[in-house]
Amino acid sequence: MERAKLHIDELNKTFKISHTNKNMRKSYQFQLTMAKLGQLNDVDDVNEQMKQVAEYSDVLIDFPADVLNLTDKQKEALDEMEQDKLQELDVTLALKIQGMSNTQIADVIDSMRDSEHGDADSKSEK
């Protein structure tokens, strides 16, 4: 598998993505965490909901920091990003690790954006 690259504007740096088993496992774990967050409405306990959201916010930084071997300063730069943009970065990274093409990744990101707008539209209709 050809080594993919990922440019992060906020860090002004391009990273080579390794398709190692270790990184694959981390990408699957990240996606599992995202899926659990998607089921948050099924959790009745508000404290548990907030705990899961807080943990997810940490994962958004920890996943790319671990895979890309980021410095503390680079992690801080990611922490200053808008959450939606950081989530897109993480999804892109996970899918690049898994060998998806840029076109496939763009389709996934577009679908995420459409889903978010759909959720906002349905909430505004209430």
Give the label of every model feature segment.
Residues D72-K126:
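C-terminal charged interaction modules
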